[in-house]
Amino acid sequence: MSQELKQEQQRVNQVIGIIQDQIDQYEESTARRRQEVVDIRKHFWEDVTVNTDNFDDFLETIISLRQQSEVLSLSQGSHRQASKRLSQLQRMQDVPYFGRIDFAEEGMGDTERVYIGVSSLTDATGEKFLIYDWRAPVSSMYYDCTPGPAEYVTPGGPIQGILEQKWQYIIRSGVIQSMFDTRLTIGDEILQQVLGQSADTHMRSIVATIQQEQNRIIRHDSTRLLIVQGAAGSGKTSAALQRIAYLLYKYRNRLTADQMLLFSPNAMFKSYVSSVLPELGEENMQQVTFQEYLNHRLSDSFDVEDPYTQLEYVLTASDDPNYNVRMAGIRFKATKAFFDRIQSCRQALEKSGMVFRDISFKGKPIASAEQINERFYREHTTLRFVNRLEKLSEWLKELVKAAEKAERRKPWVQDAIELVSNDEYQQAYVHLRKKHGMTEESVEDVDLEDVRKELARRMVRRKFKRIWQNIREMGFIDIPAIYKQMFVSHLAASEGGGAELPPEWNEIGEMTSHLLDEGKLLYEDATPYLLLKELIEGFQTNVSIRHVLVDEAQDYSPFQFEFIKRLFPAAKMTVLGDFNQAVFAHADGTDDFGMLAELYGPEHTDVILLNQSYRSTRPIVEFTRALIPGGNEIIPFDRNGNTPVLTSVADADQLHQSIRQKVKSFREQGHRTIAIICKSAAQSASVFETLHDIDDIKLITSGSIEYKQGIVVIPVYLAKGIEFDAVIVYNASDEEYGEEGLRRLFYTACTRAMHELQLYSIGEPSRFVQGAAAWIAKDSIS
């Protein structure tokens, strides 16, 4: 061991000793604070005097409750902070830091050794930093700078100086395995080790291997919208999650994880990335799929189709007579032009076109749709649209109140009163005594007739409950009828926003109307329908969310992005995607995020391109980039491996037998995650049924919420964003993948592989494979 390595190991030992001392302190303080919280909860009501005899006593009770709640909240906050710090220290025990820069600040004379780890550490005085958090301003030089003149930016301005050296450490269980001086951001030795490992059931976040271009994403803070367009395996998702950790660190006094929202592609992906932020010492941000949001808003009224059911239709239903009509609808309803059309239609409703529902009780009208319509377009026409609806709602409430009052005198009510229980009589009686301020000592009493009136009031109010709810929720507006009307009336023609309609417009309208009548809402209609509903009834925005992260952004339509922008008006946005993996029909013919630049305007938008692919071995990347136009811009990381293999087979039986053998071979090589990737969910289910005899094989569906190690059968579109040690592409034939519209789907399947890629073909291989023939080994089973 060299003298320098010996000195560095001594420092590691000292730092770990300090970490252990702090762990001991925090374990004690965490236990103490936990007990404080338990004690406060246990004695909460003992320390509060509840007295409601008069207003002053009641006010004193409220103040006492608030004080106790504040004490509890402070104790819980202290316990949370102590627990968080304890968790950070425990993670640092084995690997306290991973890098070092030697920096001589201009005008300061001495060179400072800056050690960098996943969290900061100071000495016992709290004044000297032993380790700097990777997110600290000074740490940016480790990722961005090479030895020589360098600077980093602090809240007080730039700090300049000379970066003399940059060191990298591989530390395991407190022992330095290796250390080396490097002039690169991250030495290939560390990156090779990391990338050569097996895929895991959760995404790893390894801040020691952040590359310079990824660091630009992480620390970007200059525009409202950041677009990251990255090749498959370029690390865009992990960089974006590290970006969230960085923002939580930088703005820790005014930003919390609850104010950050990640739109994930599916539930399984949510599970896959769930460990990244906790690994970095931060709480998980909120996660939701866009479909979950649509269901939350619309599933009470409709059976809402999900995006994967739509995609399954696109992939498997080309024989449907309505296929071309629906495809045209999918494409047009995803456009900004359709978004503008709905806004224009909403403007037209100011003058005419609103459709209302009757409000009735027991079949008798309280207000007919015609009366409501006439009232809306006659009264308060100078007010804003939403205020006109509020006035209309107030008028309806008055009508319902009068109808309810009149109903109390009806014979059915009097008959029902004769059948009420003693308990109901007692409740009405007690209510009236309290209402009139009678105490137990009062000599006066409630008149029996008043009790009967109170019972009648309660009984009718229960029956009218649905009507009141209907008015509160503006259920008297017939949104489905207005949406259908948009396809057939003057609203579509004269107020359409100027965009040219598809030739199939009338047929699209007929299909949409028919399905709405059946209570079904297609995926391509869900966001437009919700937008129309919001524009009419009043937009429900969320101003508490300050940052929105959209992964697999190529799967979102321009329409959906416009909707998300309106939904979170106070938020910045980071979107990540790769149009070479755009598998949904609405993205046909789109190859970049140009349309997103208009979301907030070019001056508020930055674009970062990630062209280096780290996930797969060089042979796999060389093959996959040959599958797509412009693929030569993708740069493979120089990690050796086996050439992808295409095996031609005669029939399905031969294919299945060969897959069984290949799975066995991959397992023997030590691969823990193996995916058999199919074109569709229907094909996946069939393949799983055939291969269910393979030990530990699992079927992944759109309902799967967790990815586990082993062998999985999975449709391509659910595998996006996830990586596997070895991938088997099921039947990569020209019959399966022969249309240009399937090129991106095929590319997505092949780019899931980290170490091994095996393709099978029954008959003629896909034309996409033939175009990349120079980068694949071929064999056949006769």
What is each residue range found by the language model?
Residues A267, S275, E279-E283, V288-E292, ...:
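Conserved helicase motor core of SF1/SF2 NTP-dependent helicases
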Residues M1-R41, L191-Y313, A719-K720, V727, ...:
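P-loop NTPase Walker
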Residues K250-V548, D555-F563:
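Alpha-helical nucleic-acid-binding subdomain
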